[in-house]
């Protein structure tokens, strides 16, 4: 089933959603796949990022999360990570600022003692009715958050990463097929996929794996905070499974791609978690 119609102000908050997303990995049991690894998750305050941060902690990793200003959501993520007896570093700020992209890496290394795993997950979207409605400011902001921050954070992180480390990027089904009302967003997600392929080739000689998860509809604060209420109603019903994914259902894909015991020969791949929808190619 889809979700009931609702809307809230940007950037969106978990507690204001009905129903709240399942993003605490309550039923997930770790197996030490990421024992003593140190991870940075952008957009880690809620949604997919929260579920990934908690799953990594359950697998034995310490985690830093970067987010804009959703402090209450971020503190809840920290509680969940620390409940697993792992460290959590909170890094608020605007990843659209190139200097802050470097700072979150520096603060992660300072707080955790190093950096082994990077999850580029932060995202911004603003639907439009017509292509002409996309202003230069919106176009540039969407690329700045969704694509430029990925590269800037990764560029800074590479100074601290080496053999056996991993990068996992979050794209979208819209990067595979496009979306008439999310033109700029879809363009960034397609760019992330191509960038993943290229970075995987470039970093393979260093022993750093780079992969991507491209989800279909997912129930996160991004949806009611950016989409009109009438489009939120029934969100996700179009896929064969007739519902959106919960963040908890996607986080294990990130664990798989981050864990050398599970995916040491996998790099330059995209996991498309689409609820039964198929893409050409």
Q: Model-flagged regions — what are they?
A:
Residues 132-151, 168, 192, 241:
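Catalytic Tyr-X3-Lys loop
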Residues 71, 92-105, 136, 248-249:
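The beta1-alpha1 cofactor-binding region of Rossmann-like NAD(H)/NADP(H)-dependent oxidoreductases
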Residues 172:
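Residue(s) in the substrate-gating loop at a strand-loop-helix junction
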Residues 1-2, 102, 110, 123-140, ...:
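Conserved mid-core segment of classical short-chain dehydrogenase/reductases
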Residues 4, 17, 25-26, 128, ...:
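Short C-terminal tail/terminal secondary-structure segment
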Residues 160, 208, 244-273, 278:
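C-terminal substrate-recognition "lid" of short-chain dehydrogenase/reductases
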Residues 159, 201-205:
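Alpha-helical segment proximal to the catalytic Tyr-Lys
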